[in-house]
Each structure stands twice: as C-alpha cells, then as structure tokens.
C-alpha cells in the first residue's frame, strides 16, 4: 500500500511563502485548538490531528528541513504511477529502502523526529525584548537616565546555563555509543548501502547529561525581574529605538544574551509645539496690552518661566524669538523658543468703555459709525 504524502503547508493552513512568524502563529493556534484534552468525545481524531500539526511544524520551522521538503516533498495533487498486481515500482523502492535502513525515505530527507527524551542541545542567542518608555520635553533638554523594570530570562544560577544538574556530569550517548554519528550498513538487491548521519539524541557531541537541571528543567535559563537604567540622549525623536546590548533574554544552553530594544515615546506637552530643535508657544494678550505694551510670563521646557516684554503698538500675530530657549540639536546647540502673540479684540464694550474709545477716536480723527 502506498504511503500517503502530506502537504505540511495545508496542515498548518499557511501559504508556501509564509514567514517563520506566520508559521509559528499558525502552529500555536492549531495546537491549542486540537489538543486532545479539548476533544474528549473525539480524542482519537484529535490525537491524529495534533500529531500531524506537530510533524508539519517540525519540518517547516527548520529552514534546512523546509528547503529539502520544498524540493522533494508533496506539493499539490499526489502523483500517480502505473502499478502491477505486486505493487507500484516506486512503492517497491520506498519499501526496500525502509527494509534496508528501518527508516522512512522522507525521514532521511527531513530528519527523524527525536523521541521525547532525545534532546539536541547547542548554544543559541537569546531573544530580544522590546520595551516602550515615555519621556517629557524636560528630559530632552540635557538627556535623562530613566530606571526601567521588566521580566527576562536569565542564565540559570544553579547550572550556569548548561541545563545539566550540578555534579551530574555527562555519559556517552547510548544511541551512537559516544561517536556522535549513526552508521548503518545494509545489503539489498540494489547493492551494498552505507548510511551515516548525525546522532539526533546528542546532536553530534557523543555525550548526553546524566541528569537535567532541577531549577530550569534543562533549558539553562530562568525567568527573573530586572532593573536597568536607560540613558536617553538629548532631543531624541518620538519613535526612536535604542538598543541596549545584552539587555534581552539569556541564550539557550549558555548562548549569548539578546538585546533590549527601547522605543522612546515623547509625551506631548500641551504648552508647546515641537519644530525640530525649536519650540513654538502661543500667547494671547488684550488689545489694550498690545496698544500700551506689557510684560508677560512665558514657560520654559525645562521648568520655570522667563519674562517677555511686549512693546507698545505690538500688532496681532507678531512673533518673538527667545534665543537658546528651545531644545538641543545634534551638535548640542539649543534651538529657540518662538512666541506667537495673538491679540484679543472684545466683542462687546460697556457704555463707559465705548464712551472713552469714542473720545479717543475723535481726538485721533478716526471716523466711526
């Protein structure tokens, strides 16, 4: 009977050009959906579906296995071959191959699935962690140092990241006898075959731990809360990403730490509008202040205020520029604080105010209705 080929992309419900992230998301969703414990009334079907999902993910999540699968695996409709009563020619080849090596030919292409107790252990870099931080305009004047607290995986203190229980040591891998390689020799009507591959159980090292670490379960890392201080440069732009080397998760089995990526969010200040290294501030004065002159208080981004003299006869929408009161540029030189002066004209006047203004208009020769 012919061995049914499986379309792993169809099993996970992803296109053939799916990214690793898309494959991972589909896998997580499906293993939750088809976990046998969630289908007690139809457990056998759920177990079979769950097994297929695991099998598909093991191949498609590994770039090398996926490339080999894309080249040799099942794609589209299953091809058919002319068969005799004794079975198809290619069925005989596949069956003979399995008789020789006790392995499915597709397992040779894609790699056998290790048993549950078999674990390949090699150092891998830890994942990066993304963390958003909010800063104010005052933080942008001279820069700031802001404390942050977050969770990350750190190197297991019990095993030092090896995943091995202290003093347990290693033993020769029983699968390969300590050589790190599996060699198989068989004879058939095809001739004499020699097959050699990396031992899946020890990953080619020839050794396996006698006992895995009791604290981390063999992963070499544990979850911890950490505190760090993030240095914010002056006048950083909203959305800027700062990378702190080694601030991410610990690597697997002694691998290097990932990075902490800090995304800076500048908290809007309702008093100012930011324009590069300049700040814009709008102020409204009474028409009499514009006519007679006055002094107004203007806030500064770093805190506190400064006094701005409004000369007599100031026109509406006059712009004043306070040099060096803005934000620092890339060279450390501060921009300006730009003050836009708006003049408020009253919509109604009291009888006394109107009388005074009419007398003033008469003296200045201004015609009014």
Swiss-Prot record:
Residues involved in Zn(2+) 2 binding: 173, 176, 199, 202
Going by the entry's taxonomy, the superkingdom of the source organism is recorded as: Bacteria
The signal peptide annotation in the UniProt record is none
Stored PROSITE patterns: DNAJ_1, DNAJ_2, ZF_CR
Q: How is the cofactor bound?
A: Binds 2 Zn(2+) ions per monomer.
Q: Does the keyword Metal-binding apply?
A: yes
Keywords in UniProt for this one?
Answer: Chaperone, Cytoplasm, DNA replication, Metal-binding, Repeat, Stress response, Zinc, Zinc-finger
Q: Where are the zinc fingers (CR-type)?
A: 143-225
Looking up Pfam families in the UniProt record yields:
DnaJ (PF00226), DnaJ_C (PF01556), DnaJ_CXXCXGXG (PF00684)
Q: Which CDD domains match?
A: DnaJ, DnaJ_C, DnaJ_zf
Q: Describe its assembly.
A: Homodimer.
Q: Which family does it belong to?
A: Belongs to the DnaJ family.
Q: What does this protein do?
A: Participates actively in the response to hyperosmotic and heat shock by preventing the aggregation of stress-denatured proteins and by disaggregating proteins, also in an autonomous, DnaK-independent fashion. Unfolded proteins bind initially to DnaJ; upon interaction with the DnaJ-bound protein, DnaK hydrolyzes its bound ATP, resulting in the formation of a stable complex. GrpE releases ADP from DnaK; ATP binding to DnaK triggers the release of the substrate protein, thus completing the reaction cycle.
Q: What is this protein called?
A: Chaperone protein DnaJ
Organism placement in taxonomy: Bacteria, Thermotogati, Thermotogota, Thermotogae, Thermotogales
Gene name on record?
dnaJ
């Amino acid at each position: 009977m012919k061995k049914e080929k499986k379309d792993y992309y169809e099993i996970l419900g992803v296109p053939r050009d799916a990214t690793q992230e898309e494959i991972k998301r589909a896998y997580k969703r499906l293993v939750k959906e088809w976990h046998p414990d969630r289908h007690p009334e139809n457990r056998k079907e759920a177990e079979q579906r769950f097994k297929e999902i695991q099998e598909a993910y093991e191949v498609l999540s590994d770039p090398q296995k996926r490339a080999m699968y894309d080249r040799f695996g099942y794609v589209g409709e299953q091809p058919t071959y002319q068969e005799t009563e004794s079975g198809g020619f290619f069925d005989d080849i596949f069956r003979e191959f399995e008789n020789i090596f006790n392995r499915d030919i597709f397992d040779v292409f894609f790699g056998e699935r290790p048993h549950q107790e078999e674990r390949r252990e090699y150092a891998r870099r830890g994942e990066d962690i993304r963390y958003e931080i909010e800063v104010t305009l005052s933080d942008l004047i001279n820069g700031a140092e802001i404390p942050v607290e977050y969770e990350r995986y750190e190197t297991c203190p019990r095993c030092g990241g090896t995943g091995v229980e202290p003093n347990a040591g290693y033993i020769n891998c029983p699968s390969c006898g300590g050589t790190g390689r599996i060699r198989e020799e068989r004879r058939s009507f095809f001739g004499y075959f020699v097959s050699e591959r990396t031992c899946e159980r020890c990953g080619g090292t020839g050794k396996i731990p006698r006992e895995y670490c009791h604290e981390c379960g063999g992963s070499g890392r544990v979850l911890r809360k950490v505190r760090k201080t993030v240095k914010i440069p002056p006048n950083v732009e909203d959305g800027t990403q700062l990378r702190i080397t080694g601030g991410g998760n610990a690597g697997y089995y002694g691998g290097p730490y990932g990075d902490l990526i800090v995304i800076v969010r500048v908290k809007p200040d309702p008093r100012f509008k930011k324009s590069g290294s300049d700040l814009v501030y709008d102020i409204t004065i009474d028409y009499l202040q514009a006519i007679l002159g006055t002094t107004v208080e203007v806030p500064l981004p770093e805190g506190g205020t400064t006094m701005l003299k409004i000369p007599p006869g100031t026109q509406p929408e006059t712009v004043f520029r306070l040099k060096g009161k803005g934000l620092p540029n890339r060279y450390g030189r501060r921009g300006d604080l730009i003050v836009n002066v708006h003049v408020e004209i009253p919509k109604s006047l009291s009888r006394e105010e109107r009388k005074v203004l009419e007398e003033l208009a008469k003296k200045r020769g201004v015609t009014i209705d």
